[in-house]
Every structure is written in C-alpha cells, then in structure tokens.
Amino acid sequence: ITIVGGGHAGIEAAHIAAQFGLRVAIITMPGIGLGSAPCNPSVGGVGKGQVVREIDALGGIMGVLADKAGIQFRTLNDSKGFAVQSTRVQIDKELYSVYAEELISAVENITVIREKVNTITQSEPGFEITTTERSYRTSKIIMTVGTFLNGKLHTGSSQTMGGRVDCDKSEGLQTLFSAIKTTP
C-alpha cells in the first residue's frame, strides 16, 4: 500500500496497515515532519475528542502522541454535566512530529519516502506515482493530502498558493480525483 501524505491521517493509515502485516510506503513532502499539525495545536475538545477516542479504540496513535507531546491538559465544560465535558490537550507541534517520526520509523513494515508527488496515473493493475525523484508502482493508494491539494493561503488581502506557510502545494495532484475512475 502506498499512502500519499504523512500528516495525521497518513500516519494513522500506515500504522494500522502495518499492524495487519502489510508493507506500507508513505510518500510525503520533503522538509515536513510526520503528523505535522498545520493549524490549531489542540487534540481533543468537544467535537474532536470523540474522534480521538475512536481512533484510540481502533489502535491508532494520535492519543498516544498527544499524551507525549502535550503541554496543557484540560477538561472543557467541567462545570456542566458529563455529557458535555471533554478532554483537550494543547500539543507542542514540533515535539508531536518528533514523536511521530520515532514511532513510525520503529515500525518494520513502513518506509517513508520524502519526495513531492507530481502525478498519479492509473495503470493496470494499479497505479504509477511519479515524484520529483523517480517513479513508483503500487497496487493500492490511500490519499491523505490534507491542506496541500490545490492549497491557497490568505494573508490579509493577499493570496498565495501553498499547502501552509513556508510549504509547497501539490499542484500536480489537483486533477487526480476527476481523472481516476473509482469503484464503490
């Protein structure tokens, strides 16, 4: 399995697939840490807390990484009833990525490739992925491109293209979903 994108979703997918004994390659942009949090450095909260618990129950790693990289742990709505209370942790975003790198690199079945994906084409039986460095063939792809797919940054009244500040975008992938035929 090849996973395009090494953010939260990418490392979760890679970790779970490897637990099932599958060989996994994560292709992610160079210079960006695994599990990088692009915006808000919080994990949990009233809405996202449920998702984090579900990921944890399914064997995921977000909760483990958040516990290790946490700098503030808080129960929200603690003056209200249990139904609306939730745990939220503010994380050190750089430390979170460091721990994600350590955890993923320790898993034998996962290879991390730090290259920018330019194109993905469907070629039976599977796909050909062309990066800035070389081409790869794979039978299965999981796309977890996050904010990097046709990304646009708004700063005041100006707009620039990019995945987030100081990061490139994946312009070669923006037409991917309309070009690839999917089956339910």
Language model segments and positions:
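Conserved N-terminal/central alpha/beta ligand/cofactor-binding core
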Residues: 15-119, 144-168, 172-174, 178-184
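Core beta-strand elements of the Rossmann-like FAD/NAD(P) dinucleotide-binding domain
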Residues: 131-140
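Redox-cofactor binding/interface segments in oxidoreductases and associated redox assembly factors
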Residues: 4, 143-144
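Short, hydrophobic/aromatic-rich segments at coil-to-beta transitions
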Residues: 123-128
